[in-house]
Amino acid sequence: MLDNFIVNQATKEFSVSEISNKIKELLENNFGYIKIKGEISGFKIASSGHAYFNLKENTAILACTCWRPTLAKIKFPLKDGMEVVISGKLSSYAGNSRYQLAVDNLQPAGLGTMLQILNERKTRLEKEGLFNKRRIPIPFLPTRIGVITSITGAVIKDIIHRIRERFPTHIIIWPVSVQGENSGNEIAAAIEGFNKLEEANKPSVIIVARGGGSIEDLWSFNDEILVRAAYNSKIPIISAVGHEVDYTLIDLAADKRAPTPTAAAEFAVPVRSILNNTLQSYEKVLLNNTKQLINYHEQNIANYDKIHRYLTNYINHRQQLLDETGFNLLDVLPCFIELQETKLKFCSKERINPAKIINYKTLELTHQTAYLSKSANNTLKNFEYKLELNSTLLASLDYHNVLKRGFAIVKGAMGNFLSSKITAADEKIFNIKFSDGEIKVVRN
């Protein structure tokens, strides 16, 4: 068509607007819907909400326009230096004679760009608390298992086979695309759909599964709308995306992460044969414990019966003794009363005469007074004896009495006592005191 236009219109005269419109028509009709990969530069958003930027590769530049409704659908912030893949239609802008790409869809391209977007999204969602929710425990024996995955491929077959092999359970499959532009929205809608089912049809646990792949292949499972759907789910979710080394954001929001889809099936149900063996073991233990408990209580009942018979005999014996004692009391009591009455008669009125009681107490007081007087005299004599003995001892220790026995006191010229040869060595004058006087002695 373009070649025909050049041949047919070679000699025709056009106005500027006519040729501009014709070029626009040719671009739109010949290229249609295309995909282009490049790096964003000169990104800016006008007051109208539309975005304008260039897509460049080395020295080549392509102007791009992203209208406000399309920009609102893009799930990550755009900025210079980001490598992207853009889907849209080529057109021209007559205002400055240039062609441009009208953006219809935009996806990140290149590992660096995708990791940058992933880290920024993870940090933002983590601050919101979407990865710190209270985990819902996986039920031990689910009545129904919901599986969200592609209806084709090995993943769904592996999950069904593993569940049937371990513990056959009713499976509800919600088929979705696990890769592509709208995949994240489909998976999020499936989670919300399971949660909206009536209780009679609602699954006990949901498995979100996909096989392994590159970061681009698994990108749908990093979708923000999917993370929020997993966070808000009232049904516990097991995420099984990729292989053990693959991590996506849904893994952080799910209630349990399985390294593979097969492992997710193993987390969902126990092994029936092992469960049966365990129950049989518990049954044996329970029966054995029950028998032991019955034997124990039967033995206790037998012991209680023996104790009851012993206590009954003991009580009967004591009752018999009590009866005999009662009979004896009935026989003895009249005689005892008669004896006490006789004793009472022998008690003369004079024995309780107040005058006699006073005389008796006076005599008793006299005896006590005499005893106290004698005791006081003895104590006083004892103190006098000790006092005399101590006085004699003190007198014997008086130095005057010692001098009378032939001893003397020797003092120096200054009146200091000289008690040994050493203390007297430097003295020239001595004062010697005897019992009858004192003399002064001078050393030659």
Swiss-Prot record:
Main location: cytoplasm
Matching InterPro entries: Exonuc_VII_L, Exonuc_VII_lsu_C, OB-fold_nuc-bd_dom
Localization per Swiss-Prot or TrEMBL: Cytoplasm
One MF term in the entry's GO annotations: nucleic acid binding
Pfam families to which the protein is assigned, alphabetical: Exonuc_VII_L (PF02601), tRNA_anti_2 (PF13742)
Gene Ontology, cellular component aspect: cytoplasm; exodeoxyribonuclease VII complex
The UniProt record lists the keyword Nuclease: yes
The EC number(s) this enzyme carries: 3.1.11.6
Keywords: Cytoplasm, Exonuclease, Hydrolase, Nuclease
Example GO BP: DNA catabolic process
Catalysed reactions listed for this entry: Exonucleolytic cleavage in either 5'- to 3'- or 3'- to 5'-direction to yield nucleoside 5'-phosphates
Biological function: Bidirectionally degrades single-stranded DNA into large acid-insoluble oligonucleotides, which are then degraded further into small acid-soluble oligonucleotides.
Family assignment from sequence similarity: Belongs to the XseA family.
Description of how the protein assembles with itself and partners: Heterooligomer composed of large and small subunits.
Annotated PANTHER family: EXODEOXYRIBONUCLEASE 7 LARGE SUBUNIT
Name of the protein described by the UniProt record: Exodeoxyribonuclease 7 large subunit
Organism of this sequence: Rickettsia canadensis (strain McKiel)
Lineage: Bacteria, Pseudomonadati, Pseudomonadota, Alphaproteobacteria, Rickettsiales
